[in-house]
């Protein structure tokens, strides 16, 4: 067969890989290990579109490449099958999430296998599998049973803390704990009731129960994390979100804030990703300072990084959720305050932090005294102040902070300059808040900012009105969800005291319920299972990020029934060497998994403080939406080039009925009933659609199913084409303009091994120097590009190589066999088939990447461009060692040059060896 029949070949090798477990990873290997992992998908109902496999293809290329480079590769796949996405799909389809999840996973596996990934399916995990979430629950219990000792800078058993309480109280204990934890003696501790002791320990445990301001989404019936809310709406579904106080389980991630920051310096991640985490963690060095409330027995405490600017404080702003709002509000301001607070509660903290344009606030009617100059200043409520950051109170210095300046200007509050010199004018673009020297600042006058800060801290500590402090912007993570489809939290209650289950009681299985939809009241759906609720179990479930915070470790030993994974296997596989996934997980999964890993490191379960050594964020393959333009008030559609002549509305059109921007009008009429009677105003007898690059989405009808591409062109074409679209990290629009080129390349590669009659015909003759040069040049470039994770350039390199070998009519085994190995990571199916035809009985994945030799890359000739009076007129291929005088002779003897010389002698000939020749007339 002269042509390559991809369907037959791909089915053959996919079946063979599966039957023979070709990619099964074993620990008993003398080879160096390489653990390559994709962020596992949540199995949505829509299956994969062509954007999803981008990262999977890249990681699979690296996995296959590392195998042929002599590594023992672990390349697993699983499913993040608990959580909101799976449950929302079930709600929409009216089916139980257990059923839809199973169906969706089967569909995903079918699609993934069609693309030819080298996954070790024996290690597949699912977060909704009780055998898996038993260990998610176990980790929760360990977190509950540990506290963070700042002195040793690690988590320690809570039993150690209890012993200290029993002997000396909590004096001198340096712990990560709630801000409101009170000091007590050993006698106090012993006098506490069991409930009081439990409540006290909750203030220290790494997972704890407390009254917390949360993002409540009635539409989803659950609490959402800050990163799940955008512009006051849930990112999933677009439902309104409000702020309210609820009793919730939380994770004390803030205990690890400093280590999470420091760890970023030890891992090979994109710098932009590290910066996102640094910003989210938000470490700042500053001071705590108290302001006495005028005419009230109250004090407001602020955290500030600029204690040196206190003389410039002209008002204090307080978070809308602050518990003292009521006490601070005067009768005259009550109505205005209540209205403002209600409005502010409808915005998430994330939106309030990022919105720097909107100025809004409300005066409480109260005043405080500035402790540096005894001036009376007003207390305002402002939604840019967050209750969970610092103390929920901010001292405002309009002359030194742009947000304070905008607020003060808008509400006509005083602005006192406390710095002078270059770059100290806040109204100018070159403003630098740390420039100049202090003015209007009493004992700080004349000092630089750097000098003034320690002096100001010394002052507040001597006056006992404050002290130096390190603060973090990151808050503890809400851990409970009022939804059904998640891990049950392994806690039961007795006399209002939470007790974690014994390990022997795990897994606490998710019980079946008839009605699993969320309630708008906040009562968890598990309350509907009377038998479960009557046992006193916690009715909230874990969030979607619980199971994904440690799954990478379970792949090392997925069948283990007695531990997260066996110690020898964890020690063998170690860190994930390459982690592939989207940048959208920066402040969610990628932060939580680092937190849990550090905790498991403290427990001695993993020898690695960081889970992912290298991270690559693949870009997004975007959809190219197509539009038809309907004339308003009619069912008539005008072609894109004529739409300016009419009043139109763009309508998304299914991309499958558009070819090269031309709409199949008959297919359009059949597409939807409301378009059956559509009429068209054409240009040049065709209807031309408009185009726009957007996120690939079913609602935009721009989704391209990879199955369709595989069926038409083959999996190897899809794999190579997705890489060929551009650099892996960049986003790019999907288009099929170049896919035919990749398809034809694979057929040309196939034909190198076959004669014109279609028979396999590979010669054992010795290769020429030119053939060896093509081979070794290709091997070198492909190896170097894959090593630096540049997967688009090897596709071009192979295309050039095949064209050159085709021109040389090369069919020699010495050349084609190494090329087959080198191509196998990108196009494994055709490589396996050709490897087999070459006489090998083992998989090409067991071969060794061929070594390239520099001696074959040495150029013996150079092609000189010949310029006459600055214009290139000819090219001459000459030996690289030819002397300049001989080069001149060859140039003058050239027919093209002679024509341009017109019988005249040149004034000068300039030869730049192995570069260019200039002839000056």
From Swiss-Prot:
Keywords: Aminoacyl-tRNA synthetase, ATP-binding, Cytoplasm, Ligase, Nucleotide-binding, Protein biosynthesis. It is found in: Cytoplasm. SUPFAM superfamilies: Anticodon-binding domain of a subclass of class I aminoacyl-tRNA synthetases, Nucleotidylyl transferase, ValRS/IleRS/LeuRS editing domain. The keyword Protein biosynthesis applies. One of its GO terms (biological process) is leucyl-tRNA aminoacylation. GO terms for cellular component: cytosol. InterPro entries: aa-tRNA-synth_Ia, Leu-tRNA-ligase, Leu_tRNA-synth_edit, M/V/L/I-tRNA-synth_anticd-bd, Rossmann-like_a/b/a_fold, tRNAsynth_Ia_anticodon-bd, Val/Leu/Ile-tRNA-synth_edit. It holds the Pfam family Anticodon_1. The keyword Ligase applies. A motif ('KMSKS' region) lies at residues 695-699. This is Leucine--tRNA ligase. It comes from Cytophaga hutchinsonii (strain ATCC 33406 / DSM 1761 / CIP 103989 / NBRC 15051 / NCIMB 9469 / D465).
